[in-house]
């Protein structure tokens, strides 16, 4: 069974107005209602966390990440494995 991953929008200047800061999504077995560009950018991190892995940041490892939308970084999202 896959672990749940919580995604939180921490900043938003989304050109399409899809997101606002504080929006939260729980990822289980289906992708959340994110635009495909943002989902494509974060999916590898989400997949690692869903499968119980940690992300390697060189000197540290963590069960969370922060990422920016590929559209000029207009949206910032934080993801973390739910315990």
Spans of model-derived segments:
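Short, compositionally biased
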Residues: 37-53
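Short, compact, well-ordered microdomains
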Residues: 57-83
